């Protein structure tokens, strides 16, 4: 019940003692009353306490070496990229944790968002996920190819923020300290260096739209997603402390680097380096190369940290299969152990799995599907075969030339 009178009896707020005549509205409960001013004050107190809890979580920011140790437990290789990410993430959250206590005369620390460049399956998304998990902050993934600028059919960039808010269980204060990973950022590059007269819906316009939220702004987000509508209730979120990590394969950027370095890449026999040596070119990438690829200067300027990831080779993929805490081989061994069965992979089988992933150009992300293909029939039959004690995966089984070897009691 809400109003200024209850049975024509003058009522007072149970919290501040003001009468119905001194406030705009009094809400009645079970023998208790609260005025609109106390409701507003309560909301402000709750908001401040939630913000303090979020900041308290960030006061002990893991040091770069500690972050690197975590990444090393889950991610194989990519040492330079992991070091760059560890430093960038530490500096970002150190900046966030000290922002609230800084004096007006202190140096204004600008946000350093991150650009990850590397081939498909090199671990870009997994690195971002692992960092967010280790910091216990909300994390959201978005695909740049699904975004369009305002006025076109597609997804508004604000919907990226909604995913983060949802990951934070609609706690906006927590979301404002989260991490957003935008994948396939190279797919919204301008087509060529010459700016078209008509805007490219999936290119420069989307970069401009992303630029606003990446550099820091108070954005209005539709709580149910989709396009904005007049008179629609919005969630307000400040993006100044959200860490944005964007990533893409940037296929062909090695050639841009070679041209800048003065190497001939056109004509038969002119490229003296092997394709495998492209990894060294990835470490030479500068903003000029990224701009030539098609990202606008303003957008590049908001991504000062560039982490280049290498193409994974057979040795790297075998290590990914076996070494990390959550390695795929360990996962499948655990699955079969629940049925009382031991699982073993021959060394040649691991090499065959890695070779298949390279041939398919899927990198680490393709390893699971190859194992699934190899073990599908086994995982179907094993629960019904109580006499089986061990399964051995061979090279021939991976190549589809024979079935895995079964040992019985």
Swiss-Prot record:
BP GO annotations: cell division; proteolysis involved in protein catabolic process
Keywords tagged on the record: ATP-binding, Chaperone, Metal-binding, Nucleotide-binding, Zinc
Highest rank taxon of the organism: Bacteria
Family annotation (PROSITE patterns): CLPX_ZB
Gene3D superfamilies reported in the protein's UniProt record: 1.10.8.60, ClpX chaperone, C4-type zinc finger domain, P-loop containing nucleotide triphosphate hydrolases
Binding site residues for ATP: 119-126
CDD domains named in the record: RecA-like_ClpX
InterPro entries, sorted: AAA+_ATPase (IPR003593), ATP-dep_Clp_protease_ClpX (IPR050052), ATPase_AAA_core (IPR003959), Clp_ATPase_C (IPR019489), Clp_protease_ATP-bd_su_ClpX (IPR004487), ClpX_bact (IPR046425), P-loop_NTPase (IPR027417), Znf_CppX_C4 (IPR010603)
Keyword Metal-binding among UniProt keywords: yes
Annotated binding of Zn(2+), by residue: 13, 16, 35, 38
GO molecular function, one term: protein dimerization activity
Span of domain ClpX-type ZB: 1-54
Gene Ontology CC terms, in alphabetical order: HslUV protease complex
Keyword Endoplasmic reticulum: no
Role played: ATP-dependent specificity component of the Clp protease. It directs the protease to specific substrates. Can perform chaperone functions in the absence of ClpP.
Family to which this protein belongs: Belongs to the ClpX chaperone family.
Classification via NCBIfam families: clpX, PRK05342.1
Subunit note: Component of the ClpX-ClpP complex. Forms a hexameric ring that, in the presence of ATP, binds to fourteen ClpP subunits assembled into a disk-like structure with a central cavity, resembling the structure of eukaryotic proteasomes.
Protein name: ATP-dependent Clp protease ATP-binding subunit ClpX
């Amino acid at each position: 019940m809400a109003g200024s009178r209850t049975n024509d009896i003058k009522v007072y707020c149970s919290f501040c003692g003001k009468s119905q005549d001194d406030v705009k509205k009094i809400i009645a409960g079970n023998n208790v009353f609260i005025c609109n001013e106390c409701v507003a004050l309560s909301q402000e107190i709750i908001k401040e306490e939630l913000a303090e809890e979020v900041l308290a979580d960030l006061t002990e920011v893991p040091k770069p070496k500690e972050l690197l140790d975590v990444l090393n437990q889950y991610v194989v290789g990519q040492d330079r990229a992991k070091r760059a990410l560890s430093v960038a993430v530490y500096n970002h959250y150190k900046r966030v944790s000290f922002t609230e206590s800084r004096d007006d005369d202190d140096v204004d620390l600008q946000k350093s968002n991150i650009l990850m460049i590397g081939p498909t399956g090199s671990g870009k998304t997994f690195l971002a996920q692992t960092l967010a998990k280790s910091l216990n902050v909300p994390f959201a993934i978005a695909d740049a190819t699904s975004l369009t600028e305002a006025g076109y059919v597609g997804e508004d960039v604000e919907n990226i923020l909604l995913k983060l808010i949802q990951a934070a269980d609609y706690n906006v204060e927590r979301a404002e300290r989260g991490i957003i990973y935008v994948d396939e950022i190279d797919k919204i590059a301008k087509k060529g260096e010459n700016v078209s007269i008509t805007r490219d819906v999936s290119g420069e316009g989307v970069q401009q739209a992303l630029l606003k939220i990446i550099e820091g702004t108070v954005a209005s987000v539709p709580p149910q997603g989709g396009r904005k509508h007049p008179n629609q209730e919005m969630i307000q979120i400040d993006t100044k402390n959200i860490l944005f990590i964007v990533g893409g394969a940037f296929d062909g950027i090695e050639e841009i680097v070679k041209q800048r370095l003065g190497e001939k890449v056109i004509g038969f026999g002119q490229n003296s380096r092997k394709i495998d040596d492209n990894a060294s070119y990835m470490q030479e990438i500068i903003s000029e190369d990224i701009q030539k690829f098609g990202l606008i200067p303003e957008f590049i300027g908001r991504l000062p940290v560039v982490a280049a990831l290498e193409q994974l080779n057979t040795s790297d993929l075998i290590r990914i299969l076996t070494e990390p805490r959550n390695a795929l081989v360990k996962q499948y061994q655990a699955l079969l152990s629940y049925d009382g069965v031991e699982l073993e992979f021959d060394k040649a089988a691991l090499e065959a799995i890695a070779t298949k992933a390279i041939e398919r150009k899927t990198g680490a992300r393709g390893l699971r599907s190859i194992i699934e293909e190899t073990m599908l029939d086994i995982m179907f039959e094993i629960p019904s075969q109580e006499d089986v004690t061990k399964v051995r995966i061979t090279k021939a089984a991976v190549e589809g030339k024979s079935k895995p070897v079964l040992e019985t009691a």
